[in-house]
Design a protein with these regions (language model features):
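Non-globular targeting/processing and membrane-anchoring segments
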Residues: 24-37, 141, 147-201
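Soluble non-cytosolic domains of exported or imported proteins
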Residues: 39-43, 58, 62, 78, ...
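Bacterial Sec-dependent N-terminal signal peptides
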Residues: 1-25
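A short beta-strand-turn-helix
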Residues: 40-59, 88
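Short active-site neighborhood of thiol/selenol oxidoreductases, capturing the structured segment around
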Residues: 55-69, 94
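Thioredoxin-like thiol-disulfide oxidoreductase module
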Residues: 82-84, 89-148, 156, 161-169
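Detector for the c-type heme attachment site
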Residues: 72-76
Length: 201
């Protein structure tokens, strides 16, 4: 019986000491966080134009709608990849644009209005060349040159190829088909390189 009491007291002492040590371990340490880097989305076209004047960069515009399920899937699956997020933030101005917004958009000296027949804003209609499918990604070079629309949901690997093709200026040296065929993905393992042609490349 005495042995049992001593064992219980010893165990209690060890437990209390452990709690004290744990409490003193790092009282000023910040609480652990799982927060990941996110894409620095721009939602104002006016802000985009101001940023372009200050520091010209390439542009990625994510054309979406509130009802588009594949848009949400792309947000969840593609635009959360850490390497992709970092590359976009370093090399692009990333824009989220609701294609169905009804306010007037002022862009490059032109006004764009909501077009009921398309159920979309004229800004989206022009950049998507009237192909109103969602999601839709539009790439632009510095100073809004050469807008290139890419329709449909895109995986991390597909977006990696598009992003680096424009972001690394490979479009100056190779046709897109050649580039995508010989590209080795670095950001993820998955499907083979996309065969979707890039308009004008």
């Amino acid at each position: 019986m005495l042995i049992m009491k001593r064992l219980l007291l010893s165990a209690l002492a060890v437990l209390l000491c452990g709690q004290v040590v744990q409490a003193k371990k790092d009282p000023n340490a910040p609480a652990p966080t799982d927060k990941k880097e996110e894409i620095h989305w721009i939602t104002s076209i006016d802000e985009l134009q101001a940023k372009m004047q200050q520091n010209p960069k390439k542009v990625l515009i994510d054309m979406y709608t509130g009802w588009c399920g594949w848009c949400k899937k792309m947000d969840a699956d593609t635009y959360t990849n850490p390497a992709l997020v970092k590359y976009i933030n370093n090399n692009y101005y990333a824009v989220k644009f609701d294609a169905e917004r009804q306010d007037t958009i002022h862009f490059q000296g032109k006004d764009y209005f909501f077009a009921p027949q398309y159920k979309a804003n004229g800004f989206a209609i022009e950049l998507m060349k009237g192909q109103m499918t969602y999601p839709h990604t539009v790439f632009m070079l510095e100073n809004f040159q050469n807008p290139t629309p890419i329709p449909g949901y895109r995986s991390v690997q597909e977006m990696e190829i598009f992003l680096t093709y424009f972001g690394d200026n490979m479009y100056r040296r190779r046709a897109y088909d050649e580039y995508s065929k010989n590209y080795t993905p670095r950001w993820s393992n998955g499907q083979p390189a996309p065969s979707t042609p890039v308009p004008g490349h």
